[in-house]
Amino acid sequence: MFAEKTVVITGASSGLGRQLACDLASRRARCVLFARNEAALAKVVAECEKAGGEAIAVVGDVTIPEDCERLINEASARFGGIDIYLSNAGLSMWAAFEEVKDLNIFRRLMEVNYLGAVNGLHFALPHLKQSRGHIVAIASIQSKIGVPYHTGYVASKHALEGFCRALRYELEGTGVTVLTVHPHWIRGTNMRTSACSGDGQSVGDRKLAHNGESISAAECSAAILKAIRNRDTELIIPAKLRLVPWLKLLWPSLLRRKVWSKINRQDK
């Protein structure tokens, strides 16, 4: 179903965005790759072309509405429309709230993780309605629960999920599918090293470990493409985390212990 479809991917220069771009290109999709790093984008374009797809790079920032408008205009001008909008650009956090010295961290997290999606979708939506296409928002399992040391990140992902839930209602009958994706920690991304610490700087190499329950970018991408094909509206990865909302409702004390055990293990 992806052959000759135009797919816009934000945060496409690395990690999950890069993996999605390459996987879609191997299915002969036409990929429009958006990120701030021009050199990294050029490498992903080359990988997409090698995989058999067509790809162009648009350099810009999801937090700047004018950049997002230019992204959509360039995608439409080059390929005649948009079939899938993949909102993947994201920023993480690792700091206790009382350790935060720069409150701009919270503003930045909202601007990237929530408003970054809003900015792009505002300009993409008319094209998606015309193509009866797909909106895919990469949220997080943390948009279902609260996780310590991630207060700003959790808040931004809750905002994104709430936005998508409301938008899904508004788009009933238009043929546009709104899919929210809630992955666990993903290996093969720079989300850990680029996460904000309490002083607003990147965490860097201080939190590199992933436990055995993290998932690979390839696994995550494959599940997302399957969900798009099925026109699903929600995807939780891995599947066992589908229990999280039920534990939150029926056994919150157990969920709380589980969350702390994972965080403590990650922090070692």
Question: What is the role of each PLM region?
Answer:
Residues G173-A239:
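SDR active-site lid
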